Regions:
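Alpha-helical transmembrane spans
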Residues: 1-62, 123-179
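N-terminal membrane-targeting/pre-transmembrane regions
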Residues: 56-151
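Juxtamembrane/interfacial segments around transmembrane helices
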Residues: 59-68, 91-103, 178-190, 208-218, ...
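Non-transmembrane, membrane-adjacent beta-strand/coil modules in membrane-associated proteins
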Residues: 193-260
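Conserved beta-hairpin
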Residues: 165-210
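Structured, soluble regulatory/oligomerization domains located on the cytosolic or IMS-facing side
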Residues: 235, 249-282
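Membrane-interface module
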Residues: 5-14, 31, 61-64, 83, ...
Length: 282
């Protein structure tokens, strides 16, 4: 159980739901046991989440007090425990830390020589906060409506639980937007953009050009857009063959990255300044 990603349990629950819909009634006897105990899967997933939180809280807080770098603390602790299976656990741990346990974001420290924020870009963080506020206002109204219309009262409470769980990720994304920067660390660009997008460590040597761009960038293959509720204003062109990680895809080819920053001109100048000595040496 310690090495079983939480998403595996969610996939199992979804598989049971799919099976209950497509298996013919005549051949459905083996499914009766699963259908009668369908709540077991989300219960197991909730238990795994609680175990992850309780296991990490004390250890990570101690590491953060020592270094101030919560990303490094979470990554080192989870990699030591789960090895190659650490990625989904790291995503969940960040959600709980930024969504629930973060108290003083200004005290956080991040790897890098120069840091660039993106929370003020076109009211990025403010728009996220407004959306969360609207969902909180809607929660009691939705509960009342479901309580009156649902066949059983527990369904309204179950919907509340799912909505609160979704709000956890939205709050975590908002707080990560406020405090997690895009950074330059030596000859590496560290792309941290909220917590719902996978972090990237890109060698500056792999960046062919860095320039201003407009906000009208369409979704297409090989293009990564990091915008949230802001506007795109920086374009990075990468060397051919560059592959980056994603939340759901381990590696995918990416030739261009568009992102929105509070200080695009300062970022472009800093990247070019760091690239210049290396290109002169070549």
């Amino acid at each position: 159980m310690k090495t079983l990603p939480a998403r595996l349990l969610a996939c199992c629950a979804a598989s049971l739901l799919f099976g209950s819909a497509v298996v013919p009634p005549a051949a459905k006897d083996p499914w009766r046991t699963f259908e009668d105990n369908w709540l077991l899967m989300p219960a197991l997933q909730s238990g795994l989440e609680a175990w992850l939180v309780l296991t990490l809280v004390g250890r990570v807080r101690a590491l953060v007090r020592t270094t101030g770098d919560v990303d490094a603390a979470l990554a080192s602790e989870l990699t030591a425990r789960f090895g190659k299976l650490a990625a989904p656990f790291l995503f969940e741990a960040r959600a709980w830390y930024y969504g629930v346990f973060l108290r003083d974001g200004a005290a956080l420290r991040f790897r890098g020589d120069r840091h660039f924020t993106y929370h003020a870009n076109q009211g990025n963080a403010s728009t996220q906060a407004a959306f969360i506020f609207v969902l909180l206002l809607e929660l009691p109204l939705a509960h009342l409506l479901l309580h009156c219309m649902a066949p059983a009262p527990w369904m309204a409470w179950a919907a509340d639980g799912l909505q609160l769980w979704a709000l956890l990720y939205l709050v975590a994304e908002y707080r990560a937007t406020r405090w997690r920067p895009v950074s330059l660390d030596g000859q590496t660009l560290l792309l941290r953009y909220g917590m719902l997008a996978a972090d990237q460590a890109i060698p500056l040597a792999a960046i062919v050009t860095v320039e201003r761009c407009g906000n009208d960038v369409r979704r297409r293959g090989g293009v990564m857009r990091l915008r949230q509720c802001g506007a795109l204003n920086v374009a990075l062109t990468l060397q051919a063959g560059t592959r980056l990680t994603g939340l759901l895809v381990p590696l995918r080819p990416v030739h261009q990255i568009y992102l929105g920053l509070d200080d695009p001109e300062g970022f472009i100048a800093a990247v070019r300044a760091k690239q210049a000595p290396a290109r002169v040496e070549q």
